[in-house]
Amino acid sequence: MMSSDLRLHDEALRQATGRNVKVAVIDSGINAHHSHVGKLSGGVQITCDANGEIAFSDDYRDYDGHGTAVAGIIRAKAPGVALYSVKILQDRLQTESRVLAAAIRSSIANDIRVINMSLGTHQISGIDALRQACEAAAERNIILIAAGSEERVFPASFSCVLGASGDELCGWNDYAYTENSEVEFRAHSWPRPLPGSPQGRNLRGHSMAAAHVSALVARIVETYPRSDGNAVRETLIRECTRGVDVEDDALNLDPTREKSPADYRPKQYATSNRRERQS
């Protein structure tokens, strides 16, 4: 595991693993058979049925690879977490905002402590229901992390959500903080390397940065279990290895920032997932 290499100021955080912290990955599902993930503690798929109603099923398998890559980062940096898959992204990694809102409310009902959303939308349709779901989770002391960018993206731009973007200056162990920015936190924009595959062919971007932040949040929650969103945010700021000048922020953001999570085509990771399922 790479988690012991994190350069954290707090000794207690360095020793933490996220043990028993319930983390929901709202994404394309998770492949529990992938070596980067290991055991899952549960999962659900949430969709809209033929009548336009929210529907639930227990098939949260990942046929794309995006959610598995996200889960692999969290497992590497916080190996003790209890991972839950909440599958909402379907073909082309798309969904509706009301499905995301339902996923957040489902996570509330299942006593999730940390919600990772490596996704986002610029659309304002349905935004009120999404904001209300995020606020309901935050009121119950659930920490929400979402992928963002230099443009306004939801839910990362909500005040009750910790926004994270990929920064090309951040290595695997680095975190950066941007004061007076809607998306305050920066992190590494790559997942774990895939054996036998050049890293350049792997996923990258803001989605992966959100997972890096979620892993550190899980360690914070384990160490300081009564922390609310504000306390977790302050701890994150203290642990950031550098600050980012908001005027120079766009220069450091990962070059793939123009692509939203819905644009990713992680063929190499998906191929690896299929190969491991068959072995």
Predicted feature residues:
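C-terminal subdomain of the subtilisin-like protease fold in secreted/lumenal serine endopeptidases
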Residues: M1-M2, L6, I112-N116, E222-S279
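Extracellular S/T/G-rich loop segment that most often corresponds to the catalytic His/Ser-adjacent loop
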Residues: E151-E222, R226
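Subtilisin-like peptidase catalytic core
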Residues: F56-H122, Y224, L236-V244
